[in-house]
Amino acid sequence: MATRNRTLLFRKYRNSLRSVRAPLSSSSLTGTRSGGVGPVIEMASTSLLNPNRSYAPISTEDPGTSSKGAITVGLPPAWVDVSEEISVNIQRARTKMAELGKAHAKALMPSFGDGKEDQHNIESLTQEITFLLKKSEKQLQRLSASGPSEDSNVRKNVQRSLATDLQLLSMELRKKQSTYLKRLRQQKEDGMDLEMNLSRNRYRPEEDDFGDMLNEHQMSKIKKSEEVSVEREKEIQQVVESVNDLAQIMKDLSALVIDQGTIVDRIDYNIENVATTVEDGLKQLQKAERTQRHGGMVKCASVLVILCFIMLLLLILKEIFL
């Protein structure tokens, strides 16, 4: 199903409407000084999205006074601002997603530090992305709960489009977290293998005077590998928690995407019904044409024409022989 993004055009119209101000004429200035009434700005029944849609007028003038010279300005529905905010949150989440991918790559690289700073950065980015996704999900529910009936089709289409974007973003984040989790577990297994090898070597008989120094070096490596394993275990637990949160978000968004597929199926069904109806109408039209050609009225008209022709011949013969 082809779509067109008219967001930039809509924002251009909205900004041009916001920049409109009521002109201060000399008469209005005189009225302000004498009567204490300022310039009047009214909000009347004008809409960018639906010309038949009316909005409640808002005026700064007192009851009973004339609104002559007032400028009428129309505002879009409230759900448009909500959908725009959701789009901004999705864009921010995409930016944070790119930063999270770089942080994952940096954290998985071998380094001499403890990696706490990288882990803190990953945790912060994951929490921010999850917060943006949950916030967008709640706003989507608000978008479906509010709005007039005449704009319901437009609102539902916008809602389904945003829900699809959110679902794709959640799937991408879930994939990144799963990949990061697998690589963390792989590094943990490699560290355990190294620890076992060092433990075996520790109990071998030493043949030179540097055996004690080697054992101390091996013990320090074992302790360091144990600390790394504990840190990796914490990272794995945090990644698992974030994946569970994403699973809940995916569960909530799946209903909206299923509705979109249902509507597409309904459109196909309606198109098939229209094609069947058109074929039936064509058959009825052909039947009516055949009935009109061979009907009783046509036969009567033909008989009358023949009789008129015969009477004309008789009249001519009468004039000739008489």
Swiss-Prot record:
Domain of life: Eukaryota
GO terms under cellular component: SNARE complex; trans-Golgi network
SMART domains named among the record's database cross-references: SynN, t_SNARE
Keyword Transmembrane helix: yes
Record's subcellular location: Golgi apparatus, trans-Golgi network membrane
Topology of the protein relative to the lipid bilayer: Single-pass type IV membrane protein
One function term, GO molecular function aspect: SNAP receptor activity
Gene Ontology terms: biological process: chloroplast organization; defense response to fungus; Golgi organization; Golgi to plasma membrane protein transport; Golgi to vacuole transport; intracellular protein transport; salicylic acid mediated signaling pathway; trans-Golgi network membrane organization
Cytoplasmic side: 1-301
Transmembrane segments: 302-322
Entry keyword set: Coiled coil, Golgi apparatus, Membrane, Plant defense, Protein transport, Transmembrane, Transmembrane helix, Transport
Residue ranges of every copy of the t-SNARE coiled-coil homology domain listed in the record: 226-288
Reported phenotype of the disruption mutant: Gametophytic lethal in homozygote plants. The double mutant syp41 syp42 have short roots. Plants lacking the three genes SYP41 SYP42 and SYP43 are seedling lethals.
Major localization listed first in the record, in broad terms: Golgi
Segments forming a coiled coil: 116-146
Tissue expression as described in the entry: Mostly expressed in flowers, to a lower extent in leaves and roots, and, at low levels, in stems.
Oligomeric form and interacting partners: Interacts with VTI12 and SYP61 to form a t-SNARE complex and with VPS45. Interacts with TNO1. Binds to YKT61 and YKT62. Core constituent of the SNARE complex required for membrane fusion at the trans-Golgi network.
Function per UniProt: Contributes to the regulation of secretory and vacuolar transport pathways in the post-Golgi network, and to the maintenance of the Golgi apparatus and trans-Golgi network (TGN) morphologies. Together with VTI12, required for membrane fusion. Vesicle trafficking protein that functions in the secretory pathway and mediates liposome fusion; the fusion of phospholipid vesicles containing SYP41 and VTI12 is triggered by YKT61 and YKT62. Required for extracellular resistance responses to a fungal pathogen. Also involved in the protection of chloroplasts from salicylic acid-dependent biotic stress.
Stated family: Belongs to the syntaxin family.
Record's protein name: Tlg2p-like protein a
